[in-house]
Amino acid sequence: MPGPRGAAHGLAPAMRQAGALGLLALLLLALLGPGGGAEGGPAGERGTGGGGALARERFKVVFAPVICKRTCLKGQCRDSCQQGSNMTLIGENGHSTDTLTGSGFRVVVCPLPCMNGGQCSSRNQCLCPPDFTGRFCQVPAAGTGAGTGSSGPGLARTGAMSTGPLPPLAPEGESVASKHAIYAVQVIADPPGPGEGPPAQHAAFLVPLGPGQISAEVQAPPPVVNVRVHHPPEASVQVHRIEGPNAEGPASSQHLLPHPKPQHPRPPTQKPLGRCFQDTLPKQPCGSNPLPGLTKQEDCCGSIGTAWGQSKCHKCPQLQYTGVQKPGPVRGEVGADCPQGYKRLNSTHCQDINECAMPGMCRHGDCLNNPGSYRCVCPPGHSLGPSRTQCIADKPEEKSLCFRLVSTEHQCQHPLTTRLTRQLCCCSVGKAWGARCQRCPADGTAAFKEICPAGKGYHILTSHQTLTIQGESDFSLFLHPDGPPKPQQLPESPSRAPPLEDTEEERGVTMDPPVSEERSVQQSHPTTTTSPPRPYPELISRPSPPTFHRFLPDLPPSRSAVEIAPTQVTETDECRLNQNICGHGQCVPGPSDYSCHCNAGYRSHPQHRYCVDVNECEAEPCGPGKGICMNTGGSYNCHCNRGYRLHVGAGGRSCVDLNECTKPHLCGDGGFCINFPGHYKCNCYPGYRLKASRPPICEDIDECRDPSTCPDGKCENKPGSFKCIACQPGYRSQGGGACRDVNECSEGTPCSPGWCENLPGSYRCTCAQGYEPAQDGLSCIDVDECEAGKVCQDGICTNTPGSFQCQCLSGYHLSRDRSRCEDIDECDFPAACIGGDCINTNGSYRCLCPQGHRLVGGRKCQDIDECSQDPGLCLPHGACENLQGSYVCVCDEGFTLTQDQHGCEEVEQPHHKKECYLNFDDTVFCDSVLATNVTQQECCCSLGAGWGDHCEIYPCPVYSSAEFHSLCPDGKGYTQDNNIVNYGIPAHRDIDECILFGAEICKEGKCVNTQPGYECYCKQGFYYDGNLLECVDVDECLDESNCRNGVCENTRGGYRCACTPPAEYSPAQRQCLSPEEMEHAPERREVCWGQRGEDGMCMGPLAGPALTFDDCCCRQGRGWGTQCRPCPPRGTGSQCPTSQSESNSFWDTSPLLLGKSPRDEDSSEEDSDECRCVSGRCVPRPGGAVCECPGGFQLDASRARCVDIDECRELNQRGLLCKSERCVNTSGSFRCVCKAGFTRSRPHGACVPQRRR
């Protein structure tokens, strides 16, 4: 019955993006039934069943990219692949369309039922085999002989498929040639068999997407894609290439049919892809040059390959097929292989291997597929290579040196006297060739076969070459150097010729000398010329009818057979027709075939078709590097290298070393002989050298021939040595002759700087000033005035040629004659040592301060306030009281002064006191010392993590543990006081961490004790970091509102805002404003003018800093700013406040004032209009302006000047600022400096004892 009308049901794509397929344009063609052809076709072109069933089924196609690469290391290459993301296309009933478009995909539904092996490529086009044409490949092509040489549909350029006569109706935008590989997937419905169930099956394919990355050394495998098609069990699946990268036509096809309905319900799996090798190396299964692309093992080993593999290489198995193509079907038992050029399709069918579909076949030429074989046609200027898979460009033979030996140092030795071509050199006795010492390829490799296709001892004669490729239709190609190629008609043969093998005849290389008569490999019939010359070599083939592959019905396992049925062939006796069919062997006829019994030295072809010579040289019987093995018919010969001799033993011929050192006196009397494999070496004794003779010997060296041997005397030669007869000093011989006086003054300037006077046998020097003669009087040397020590005393003396320079040290100055340094008496200056005794020293002075005083600035003695300098003095059980030049401790009750009166100690110390450590996390945890004289309870019940002395630390017990409650029964922050007992139980007291640990826990802040614990208060602009135990600067620049439209720079306790001119920073608005905006800003400061004339000109600028408009006009100003803005009349402006409504947030929040208000000490109100405020600012107040000082400053007694506050003196009485450190006052602030012998640790910044190195 006819199929459904129109196109088959389409595919609904549901795609996911994948990296490797995102840019790939794939063409998916789905045939949902043989009856899906276009209407109006002939009746024979329509299917008869199964289409409707498949159209109702839902199927799915999954594309899984696999990206492969090749890694080579030390000559070993390995391929590895990685799985990419999947893409899925789903088709089901009810979504019929001609074209579906997705991201990176073009989906076309094809309604054509291509017949006779045709493959659907688009909506209206079939790719037909060479023997058929027509829209559906239903019409046999006229003259289907493969050798017609025509350009019709039967002969495609790159494969065996051709399109019908109808033009393709591809949708707009589709390209015939693409840089990507385009494949078609066909799902074809078959009639369901009896008893088959509905479960779906799936088929998998692994196809290449395009060429791999090619470099100068490594050719990476191309990326591949794994295609999985889920389909009903009655359907079959085919995948074939529509277009390859930069191709001009169809490239290849792959077919996969589902398994017959068997005992195994598991779906078929995709066979892996690997590398196909055509040659093998000695002791290795594979060669070094595989085909560029990936192939299946059955395609490789069933056609041109000898080995196949993926990460490892394996030799191809021997084919088990022993049948001969004769009339009628040829049956073999189950498990038998298909013949050469075919692969098994199922248990009863063999399918032709399309060698042209293998990547890299017939490079630089055209590949033509034949049933069971293929053909390579090379363009002019190219010839078929020995591997028969590529065309090689003809190049003129260059002649150069031929070397017979290559040393272990990669140096070429023993060149031949005549120049040879690389082929003549490497195919005979040469080991390297050319001026660059190019090594000859190893025997048996692909490179060796490339230049020596006939093996060692043979070379190609360019006068006559015969290239023969035998397939289903035999043909020969003759190349003539003197004329165009002439086609040769071959006789028809009743059977297929044996496959090619790597022998001289099968390579098509004739080893006989040139002859005048043209003859082919099969010399049975004369040749005829039937066509004029053409630019390409013409192919002449024997016509052969098409081969039909008939599928036999299913038979029992014992009767299953493989059938390949060629038609119109008569049965013949090959042994009788061709007596030399086996070559070097005897042909034995059989009932259905013949076999060959080969002679000694020959082996049977793998297909048992004829005898080929055994190449004994592959095993290197002559020895590596010892000789050249020449393979002969049935045997071999050894041509030993120099230094080796021929040895004939039970194991055959070989080359053994020749010991030349057995010959006496081989190296002469001046040396000895050392034998090496293949050569010998003469080692000469000292005083002898090797003479370049044949053979080389050691001869005496006449050292006296060299004039430099005895430059100062006469030379006398001796065997192996020489003797010099010295001349008198000042005399010299001329080449061993008489001794003559040497004029030293004429040979140079030995007395420079000075004058030379020649004397008999010597000379004399008169030196210039600053130089003196040397001890021998033969040269002038510089006088080192600095070495004598008489100049530059108390300075650095630098010697110069003929003189010297003085550089005085600190405390010295240069004398008038600039020859010495004189001391500077610093005590002559009154300010050198104020309050102390000045003692002048050489180059410096000393200021000795009385006891209890210290030197300030190196010039002033000041009383040391030990109590403020070290707040920890007398703590924790006493108070420090400063004295002039000393201090004393006032101890608490229960404590007494120490002997030095500088500390308080308990009358009785029931507890030991040691150091308290903060944590063990520091790299050097010994530096994290909180206190140095505390009990274990005071340490571990408060902030301590360990307690001990000198880094012998006892960890504090874990909080809430039994040990902790035993040590700290009252909890964190409390300790027991044994002096206070309530009801027999010691009372607890709070631990004052601020006194116990001081600045170690509240750095840069004020510590306030609480019960329990403590609080650390920081200055404005700082915050307390509980991990660092210190006040850390606040980065105001992190707040974008602080410096809008400007560049914010964080400072310690504040920040700066840099504006781009002419913009200015507005503190009130915390942003950069333009001049127009600043004009109306209340905080803008400019010059204040004391007078303003009637003409609007301002004059008399007021002294002091710039003021705002309000500050200027509320005082004595009459004009303001560079534009001389007039001030309003007194009492009329609203900008001058009448009551105190302002507050200074700085003074309200500054902890440094300790309760002092600016109204009391830091401001000055003036009743008059004038306000004098040096280093501060005037603020208008009722009754007059007030002088206010910035942070860190206070008003002096005059109330008109801001002076710096000495925080170290006023605020560090109890060590609130710098505990255990030295406080240094700065302008507006202060800083803490560690005492001598201490250094600041990280990360807490505490001062710890400096380690001695």
Curated annotation (Swiss-Prot):
Disulfide partners: 110-120, 114-126, 128-137, 276-300, 286-313, 301-316, 356-367, 362-376, 378-391, 402-425, 412-437, 426-440, 427-452, 575-587, 582-596, 598-611, 617-629, 622-638, 661-673, 667-682, 684-698, 745-756, 751-765, 767-780, 786-797, 792-806, 808-821, 827-838, 833-847, 849-861, 867-880, 874-889, 891-904, 916-939, 926-951, 940-956, 941-968, 994-1007, 1002-1016, 1018-1031, 1037-1048, 1043-1057, 1059-1072, 1113-1127, 1114-1136, 1208-1223, 1218-1232
Highest taxon in the source lineage: Eukaryota
Subcellular location: Secreted; Secreted, Extracellular space, Extracellular matrix
CC terms in the record's Gene Ontology section: extracellular matrix; extracellular region
GO biological process: bone mineralization; bone morphogenesis; bone remodeling; chondrocyte differentiation; lung saccule development; negative regulation of bone mineralization; negative regulation of chondrocyte differentiation; positive regulation of bone resorption
Keyword ATP-binding appears in the UniProt entry: no
Protein name: Latent-transforming growth factor beta-binding protein 3
Protein purpose: Key regulator of transforming growth factor beta (TGFB1, TGFB2 and TGFB3) that controls TGF-beta activation by maintaining it in a latent state during storage in extracellular space. Associates specifically via disulfide bonds with the Latency-associated peptide (LAP), which is the regulatory chain of TGF-beta, and regulates integrin-dependent activation of TGF-beta.
Signal peptide: 1-38
Family according to the record: Belongs to the LTBP family.
GO molecular function: calcium ion binding; transforming growth factor beta binding
Post-translational modification: Contains hydroxylated asparagine residues. Two intrachain disulfide bonds from the TB3 domain are rearranged upon TGFB1 binding, and form interchain bonds with TGFB1 propeptide, anchoring it to the extracellular matrix.
Domain TB: 274-328, 400-452, 914-968, 1086-1136
Keywords: Disulfide bond, EGF-like domain, Extracellular matrix, Glycoprotein, Growth factor binding, Repeat, Secreted, Signal
